[in-house]
UniProtKB/Swiss-Prot annotation:
GO terms for cellular component: axon; dendritic spine; membrane; plasma membrane; voltage-gated potassium channel complex. Detected in cerebellum, corpus striatum, hippocampus, cerebral cortex and brain stem (at protein level). The chain crosses the membrane at residues 313-334, 379-400, 412-432, 448-468, 484-505, 547-575. SUPFAM superfamilies: POZ domain, Voltage-gated potassium channels. It comes from Bos taurus. This is Potassium voltage-gated channel subfamily A member 4. Belongs to the potassium channel family. A (Shaker) (TC 1.A.1.2) subfamily. Kv1.4/KCNA4 sub-subfamily.
Length: 660
């Protein structure tokens, strides 16, 4: 009896099980202990009676439990089919033990019979408990040992329904979907911050670093079963959202633009995503502006007149163009000086054949005696030289441009046309007046006024300097990006002008010496006051008018102060972007040479001071032909001991190719 109790206690529950399962196991253990004591007593009594009687039935010395054959089967059909009918009630288990195992105990030998009986009972109970646990685990996952396959519980239900003749879909509406297809997850560790997503989310973009299994394999950590990237953590939120949203890329506010751009390039999201992101950030595409003509001769001409940094001749042409523009602007301003304006008016009157004004003055020289005409005027000669250069430059650029449609859509080319046309219109009008003679003083005065207006357009030549000035280009980009803010500023000023001009008019209506005779007369005062200029030519006199003027000045300060910071922010953005581009150009010039890169090609890449026309074309075509000039990977990898040096050279060469 003592041996039986010790054997029963030795097969106790596992103390490392969870609390709920451990309590149930202890309850079952107490039931088995009581049952074992009763069974041991009955077995000892039966064995003693059998020895004394000297007889007994000759049966097999050991029988398996009736349910063990079904429980231990690993057949995928019979084993799974028997799982649903295998769990008897605990009370039935007790009866089953008594009816199946105990009648055969009479054949056991007295020596050690109690210990063997208890061992068999304990093993059978443990096997039944293990099978019950396996059946519970089978609800989620099942392993077929014979075939080495892994399938979900829903697959087993589908197989049982199809092969075992089970009716319906079963499983409470579960479908036959593989576990790996719907629930396969991947863990991504970015500098210690772990992200978890599904494989199908990354598979939407198979060309990217995370979407291509082969590309991301080199970052896999088998010990932690995760992918590790030593990259910027805040940027990865937007990178992962790019996969989750199906292609929407938005930079976090706490990540600088250059850092986020590097992360986008590292994760290989593609050029299309990068270009779209740059457009959202305010960048302007320049692919069309950077296009080159297909004809070689036109290409050289286009490089000379369009890209001053291409070569020394192109830089010289740019300097000449800037000087001509400055001379034209200086002449436009000097001809309005009083000492030159009288002669200019006289020449214009002589050319138009007028007989009034200066010509009616007795002190004025007579037209027949004066040898001055518009064609021998120094200002006209200088203006003609400038126009000849502008016309030549425009015609050559129009001839060599890659696309005529894009050429005439460019705002800089439109400015060139506007700056050239007034000269030819003025020249044609002067020639027509000289050939036609005097046709009336009123008609001549009208034509003279029109010519003055047309000549005023010459002031737009100053915008031609923006072609050669980065500062003016930045200002143009700033104004174009701030059109909405400028529109709001004008709208606010318009509302303020209407409001305060009306208020000051009615406030000063009873004052006889007031300057505000009408509301339109007060518009000028409202604009000057709101912009804090304050000329003082118009001012309120009454107390009510002064109060309105004070409110107008305060409202003007607030109105201008609201949109101005946004405009300044846009200017800083474009300025820093231009600075970053210049820094990248300097880094490109300091790139380490590759041993397989031709020295003359690298020399022309580092400095563009050559004198031939073909140098810049080769410089700009380097992006297309650099792959043929750089060392191939196979050649670099076949150097043996110099593999590390070759790898560095390849990386530097790639940097050169990217920066170009």
């Amino acid at each position: 009896m003592e041996v039986a109790m010790v054997s029963a206690e030795s097969s106790g529950c596992n103390s490392h099980m969870p609390y709920g399962y451990a309590a149930q196991a202890r309850a079952r253990e107490r039931e088995r202990l009581a049952h074992s004591r009763a069974a041991a007593a009955a077995a000892v009594a039966a064995a003693t009676a059998a020895v004394e009687g000297g007889g007994g039935s000759g049966g097999s010395q050991h029988h398996h439990h009736p349910s063990r054959g079904a429980c231990t089967s690993h057949d995928p059909q019979s084993g799974r089919g028997s799982r649903r009918r295998r769990r008897p009630h605990p009370e039935k288990k007790k009866v089953h033990h008594r009816q199946s195992s105990f009648p055969h105990c009479s054949d056991l030998m007295p020596s050690g019979s109690e210990e063997k009986i208890l061992r068999d009972l304990s093993e059978e109970d443990e096997e039944e408990d293990d099978e019950e646990d396996e059946e519970e685990e089978g609800r989620f996952y099942y392993s077929e040992e014979d075939h080495g396959e892994e399938c979900s519980y829903t697959d087993l239900l589908a197989q049982d329904d199809g092969g075992g003749g089970g009716g319906g879909s079963g499983g409470g509406g579960y479908s036959s979907v593989r576990y790996s297809d719907c629930c396969e997850r991947v863990v991504i560790n970015v500098s210690g911050l772990r992200f978890e997503t599904q494989m199908k989310t990354l598979a939407q973009f198979p060309e990217t670093l995370l979407g291509d299994p082969e590309k991301r394999t080199q970052y896999f950590d088998p010990l932690r079963n995760e992918y590790f990237f030593d990259r910027n953590r805040p940027s990865f939120d937007a990178i992962l959202y790019y996969y989750q949203s199906g292609g929407r890329l938005k930079r976090p506010v706490n990540v600088p633009f250059d850092i986020f751009t590097e992360e986008v390039k590292f994760y290989q999201l593609g050029e299309e995503a990068l270009l779209k992101f740059r457009e959202d950030e305010g960048f302007v595409r320049e692919e069309e502006d950077r296009a080159l003509p297909e004809n070689e001769f036109k290409k050289q001409i286009w490089l000379l007149f369009e890209y001053p940094e291409s070569s020394s001749p192109a830089r010289g042409i740019a300097i000449v163009s800037v000087l001509v523009i400055l001379i034209s602007i200086v002449i436009f301003c000097l001809e309005t000086l009083p000492e030159f304006r009288d002669d200019r008016d006289l020449i214009m009157a002589l050319s138009t054949g007028g007989h009034g004004g200066l010509l009616n003055d007795t002190s004025a020289p007579h037209p027949e005696n004066s040898g001055h005409t518009i064609f021998n005027d120094p200002f006209f000669i200088v203006e003609t030289v400038c126009i000849v250069w502008f016309s030549f430059e425009f015609v050559v650029r129009c001839f060599a441009c890659p696309s005529q449609a894009l050429f005439f859509k460019n705002i800089m080319n439109i400015i060139d046309i506007v700056s050239i046309l007034p000269y030819f219109i003025t020249l044609g009008t002067d020639l027509a007046q000289q050939q036609g003679g005097g046709n009336g003083q009123q008609q001549q005065a009208m034509s003279f006024a029109i010519l003055r207006i047309i000549r005023l357009v010459r002031v737009f030549r100053i915008f031609k300097l923006s072609r050669h000035s980065k500062g003016l280009q930045i200002l143009g980009h700033t104004l174009r990006a701030s059109m909405r803010e400028l529109g709001l500023l004008i709208f606010f000023l318009f509302i303020g002008v209407i409001l305060f001009s009306s208020a000051v008019y009615f406030a000063e209506a009873d004052e006889p010496t007031t300057h505000f005779q009408s509301i339109p007369d007060a518009f000028w005062w409202a604009v000057v006051t709101m912009t804090t200029v304050g000329y003082g030519d118009m001012k309120p006199i009454t107390v009510g008018g002064k109060i309105v003027g004070s409110l107008c000045a305060i409202a003007g300060v607030l109105t201008i102060a609201l949109p101005v910071p946004v405009i300044v922010s846009n200017f800083n953005y474009f300025y820093h972007r231009e600075t970053e581009n210049e820094e990248q150009t300097q880094l490109t010039q300091n790139a380490v040479s590759c041993p397989y890169l031709p020295s003359n090609l690298l020399k022309k890449f580092r400095s563009s001071t050559s004198s031939s026309l073909g140098d810049k074309s080769e410089y700009l075509e380097m992006e297309e032909g650099v792959k043929e000039s750089l060392c191939a990977k196979e050649k670099c990898q076949g150097k043996g001991d110099d593999s590390e040096t070759d790898k560095n050279n390849v990386s530097n060469a790639k940097a050169v190719e990217t920066d170009v």
